[in-house]
Each structure stands twice: as C-alpha cells, then as structure tokens.
C-alpha cells in the first residue's frame, strides 16, 4: 500500500508543487534583504570597528605611552615604543596595530586612561595584502583626525552608559 502511495506521489509530483507553493507564498511579500553598498545597516554607538588615535584640541596627541592597551590586548596585536621627553613626560615613537591579529574586543579602548585609542564606526576597509592591515601611528592618527567629529558625537551619545 505504501509503495503505491509513493508511486502516485512521485507521478503527480506532489513534492514539487509543495515547494512551489512555499516559493509562491514568499515571492510577493516585501523583501527584507538590504542592497548592501547602496543601503547601509545602521550601527550602534558602541560598534567596534577600525581603530583611531585621537588628539587634544590643541593638536597634541593624547597617548601618554602608559602601555596599558598593549598589556591588556588578548591577541597581542598592539606594539608600542616610547621615549622620554625633555619635560619628563613619555610620548610614543611607535604605535602599531596588526588588524589581522585584532579581535576587536575593545579592551584597549576601555583601559586607556586618556581616551587616546578608540574604535570607530568604520567597518568598510580592506587590504589586498597582509601589510595593508598593519596600521602605524601616523595612519591611526590620520583616521582619528578625519573622523574626530563623528568619534566625539558617538562617545557623547554613549556617555550615560559608561
């Protein structure tokens, strides 16, 4: 009896029509997929993307070379070298982040006592070779200078929750 039922089921293509009915059901509904390059998904104020080094309003870089971000980084993606200034303060001579190692956990941003290193909202970056994802101090400062207004706005939005 079961064999006869299977024979007529395959002869009448019932599985095919069940699938077509399901396809037809969703074919005319509103699409939920975003067309990515033209339509962007909104990100939260706490989104962790590309890193940036910030400056004070007078143009001096904020990093005081305390190396807390280097120590707290679980992926060992941050490398810092510093030197002593004439006035006794330390400043960085080298600040590198290897984005191929970085896991974007945000520990570096949380540990920074002067809000020097931040993770921006930028997630659309790429590299054609491995060295393109190795950010130096000058590159990080350039990102910070370019997006300072956006960084400050997002940090102000997030301030009540910190």
From Swiss-Prot:
Location of this chain's protein in the cell: Cell inner membrane
Where does the 4Fe-4S ferredoxin-type domain start and stop, copy by copy? 53-83, 93-122
EC no. given is 7.1.1.-
Q: Which residues bind [4Fe-4S] cluster 1?
A: 63, 66, 69, 112
Q: Name one Pfam family in it.
A: Fer4_7
User: What InterPro entries is this protein classified in?
Assistant: 4Fe4S_Fe-S-bd, 4Fe4S_Fe_S_CS, NADH_quinone_OxRdtase_chainI
Keywords carried by this UniProt record: 4Fe-4S, Cell inner membrane, Cell membrane, Iron, Iron-sulfur, Membrane, Metal-binding, NAD, Quinone, Repeat, Translocase, Ubiquinone
Instruction: Report the membrane topology from the UniProt record.
Output: Peripheral membrane protein
Fetch the SUPFAM superfamilies from UniProt: 4Fe-4S ferredoxins
Which GO terms fall under biological process for this protein? aerobic respiration
Which HAMAP family does the record match to this protein? NDH1_NuoI
What the protein does comes down to:
NDH-1 shuttles electrons from NADH, via FMN and iron-sulfur (Fe-S) centers, to quinones in the respiratory chain. The immediate electron acceptor for the enzyme in this species is believed to be ubiquinone. Couples the redox reaction to proton translocation (for every two electrons transferred, four hydrogen ions are translocated across the cytoplasmic membrane), and thus conserves the redox energy in a proton gradient.
Of which family is this protein a member? Belongs to the complex I 23 kDa subunit family.
| Name listed for the protein in its UniProt record | NADH-quinone oxidoreductase subunit I
Native source organism of the sequence:
Bordetella pertussis (strain Tohama I / ATCC BAA-589 / NCTC 13251)
Gene that produces this protein: nuoI
């Amino acid at each position: 009896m079961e064999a006869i039922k299977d024979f007529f089921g395959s002869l009448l293509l019932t599985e095919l029509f069940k699938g077509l009915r399901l396809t037809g059901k969703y074919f005319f509904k509103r699409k939920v997929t975003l067309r990515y390059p033209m339509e962007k998904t909104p990100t939260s104020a706490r989104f962790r993307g590309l890193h940036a080094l910030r400056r004070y309003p007078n143009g001096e870089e904020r990093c005081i070379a305390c190396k807390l971000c280097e120590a707290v980084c679980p992926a060992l993606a941050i490398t810092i070298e510093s030197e002593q200034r004439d006035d006794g303060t330390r400043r960085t001579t080298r600040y590198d982040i290897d984005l191929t190692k970085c896991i974007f956990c945000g520990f570096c941003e949380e540990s920074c006592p002067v809000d020097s290193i931040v993770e921006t909202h930028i997630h659309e970056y790429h590299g054609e070779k491995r060295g393109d994802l190795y950010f130096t101090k000058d590159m990080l400062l350039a990102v910070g200078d370019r997006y300072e207004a956006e960084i400050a706005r997002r940090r102000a939005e997030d301030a009540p929750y910190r």
